[in-house]
């Protein structure tokens, strides 16, 4: 009898510890990062060269193969030497992207920020939407990303959350991930299949903070007006990432915005 009580007590204790541990993980997963204050090592910028960095998620990571093309486009339009560097993390949410801005080495983008580029293209949001992080968490960390860039004198170029086949993403995920996302959807009150609320929330954030004049915002409809359904030719077979044609179209749109902005600014 005593042995059974001991066994039951041990099992109960293990369950309790497991629940507490899961609770801490859950809390950390949805936690809001605090703003990190960084002191730049470099305080000078090469006025003869337009420097553009592309940071964020997988769209930034895979753009590295097209850096030379974007560089050529900008140089042809703006008539100034241009440097383009892309570095992103596949699957990164805005929280991770912000933290990477303060990390040196292969896993961070701090070294790119400290180049003091003229522009920083930011691709973020699709992974927040898929993981159901909620618009509050998404906008909080996106706001920190924008503030970090502006504090360094870098103009953000915000790429609106793209039109992709989100259902195709879910279909490829393991059952555990699907369950986790449904729980997250319930916890954050984020719709399971609708992602327009993330776009709307980001637009409102930019307007409310009155920073819309300090950045460039590129709606997805501006470079892909037909939307995902009629633009399969722009995406890879995974239904999520741009192929070469997609990047060429996006780069053309980015170039136009940089040309317009640089025409009104003297670097």
What are these regions (language model features)?
Residues 152-155:
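A short helix->loop->beta-strand "cap" motif at the edges of active sites that frequently abuts
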Residues 61-65, 132-140, 189-196, 240-248:
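Soluble non-cytosolic domains of exported or imported proteins
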Residues 46-54, 59-140:
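Conserved SGNH/GDSL esterase-like catalytic core that processes O-acyl groups on lipids
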Residues 168-219:
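Substrate-gating cap/lid alpha-helix
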């Amino acid at each position: 009898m005593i042995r059974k009580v001991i066994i039951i007590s041990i099992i109960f204790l293990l369950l309790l510890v497991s629940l507490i541990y899961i609770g801490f993980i859950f809390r950390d997963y949805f936690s809001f990062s605090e703003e990190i204050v960084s002191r730049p090592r470099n305080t000078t910028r090469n006025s003869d060269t337009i420097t553009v960095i592309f940071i964020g998620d997988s769209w930034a990571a895979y753009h590295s193969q097209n850096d030379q093309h974007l560089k050529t486009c900008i140089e042809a339009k703006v008539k100034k030497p241009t440097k383009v560097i892309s570095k992103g993390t596949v699957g990164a949410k805005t929280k991770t992207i912000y933290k990477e801005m303060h990390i040196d080495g292969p896993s961070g983008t701090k070294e790119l920020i400290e180049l003091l580029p003229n522009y920083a293209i930011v691709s973020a949001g699709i992974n927040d939407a898929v993981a159901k992080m909620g618009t509050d968490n998404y906008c909080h960390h996106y706001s920190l990303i924008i503030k970090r860039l502006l504090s360094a004198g870098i103009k953000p170029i915000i790429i609106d959350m793209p039109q992709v086949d989100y259902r195709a993403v879910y279909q490829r995920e393991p059952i555990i991930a699907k369950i986790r996302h449904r729980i997250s959807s319930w916890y954050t009150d984020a719709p399971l299949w609708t992602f327009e609320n993330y776009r709307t929330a980001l637009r409102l954030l930019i307007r409310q903070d009155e920073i819309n004049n300090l950045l460039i915002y590129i709606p997805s409809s501006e470079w892909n007006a037909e939307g995902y359904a009629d633009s399969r030719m722009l995406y890879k077979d995974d239904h999520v990432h741009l192929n070469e044609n997609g990047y060429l179209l996006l780069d053309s749109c980015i170039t136009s915005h940089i040309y317009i902005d640089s025409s009104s600014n003297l670097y």
